């Protein structure tokens, strides 16, 4: 009987070693050699401290900063572990809202978000990405239109000329990947860091 099982056991051990150890270690080594910043999470540092990742959004709420998309991520409720509470940009619990198009809760949230956005800029249509969360809830980017929509609020809060902010946004626009994939976008963390440098 051992004779019949032995080839299967040898194959199991060999493939486990190959796919569980050799391949991941080889890919990690290649990534560290060719793309070390990306392999380590595209971390962004300021004054020697890691302040975030270019790949994961952050919850900016101060009027002096550009805001990202809403995040639907949650965390366990400290008072009742069977429930959850909102925890924007919680990378440990990446998910969308899972609310359907006929959901009353979704309609209520969208209406409140649109009304809040209109307070900052009542004359322009609200870009959809300022009121809808991404599938992961962690999207670090917004459309150039969403960034431009926020210019009046940021300019007023900082006392900066709107034309300077529009020029700053233009300098931060990332084009389509390979010239055809995705849409032009602005990384909110990088934009806010550039904003702080400009104001300094």
From Swiss-Prot:
GO MF term set: ATP binding; P-type potassium transmembrane transporter activity
Domain of life: Bacteria
Region (Disordered): 68-97
Entry keyword set: ATP-binding, Cell inner membrane, Cell membrane, Ion transport, Membrane, Nucleotide-binding, Potassium, Potassium transport, Transmembrane, Transmembrane helix, Transport
Subcellular location, record wording: Cell inner membrane
Listed transmembrane segments: 9-31
GO cellular component: plasma membrane
Residue spans of biased composition, Polar residues class: 71-96
Disulfide bonds: none
Position of the signal peptide: none
Keyword ATP-binding (UniProt): yes
Entry keyword annotation includes Membrane: yes
Membrane topology qualifier: Single-pass membrane protein
Subunit structure: The system is composed of three essential subunits: KdpA, KdpB and KdpC.
Family from the record: Belongs to the KdpC family.
Function statement: Part of the high-affinity ATP-driven potassium transport (or Kdp) system, which catalyzes the hydrolysis of ATP coupled with the electrogenic transport of potassium into the cytoplasm. This subunit acts as a catalytic chaperone that increases the ATP-binding affinity of the ATP-hydrolyzing subunit KdpB by the formation of a transient KdpB/KdpC/ATP ternary complex.
Name of the protein this chain belongs to: Potassium-transporting ATPase KdpC subunit
Source species: Rhodopseudomonas palustris (strain BisA53)
Source taxonomy: Bacteria, Pseudomonadati, Pseudomonadota, Alphaproteobacteria, Hyphomicrobiales
Gene that encodes the chain: kdpC
């Amino acid at each position: 009987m051992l004779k019949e099982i032995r080839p299967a056991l040898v194959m199991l051990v060999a493939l486990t070693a190959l796919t569980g150890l050799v391949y991941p270690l080889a890919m990690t080594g290649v990534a560290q050699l060719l793309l070390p910043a990306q392999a380590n999470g595209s971390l962004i540092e300021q004054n020697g401290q890691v302040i975030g990742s270019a790949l994961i959004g952050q919850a900016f709420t101060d009027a002096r900063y550009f805001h990202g998309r809403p995040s639907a991520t949650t965390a366990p409720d400290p008072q009742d572990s069977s429930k959850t509470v909102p925890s924007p940009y919680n990378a440990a619990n990446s998910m969308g809202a899972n609310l359907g198009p006929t959901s009353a809760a979704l309609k209520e949230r969208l209406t409140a978000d649109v009304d809040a956005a209109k307070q900052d800029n009542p004359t322009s249509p609200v870009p959809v990405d300022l009121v809808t969360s991404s599938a992961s809830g962690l999207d670090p980017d917004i459309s150039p239109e969403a960034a431009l929509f926020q210019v009046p609020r940021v300019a007023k809060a900082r006392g900066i000329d709107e034309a300077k902010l529009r020029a700053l946004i233009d300098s931060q626009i990332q084009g389509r990947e390979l010239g055809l994939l995705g849409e032009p976008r602005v990384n909110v963390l990088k934009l806010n860091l550039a904003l702080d440098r400009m104001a300094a």
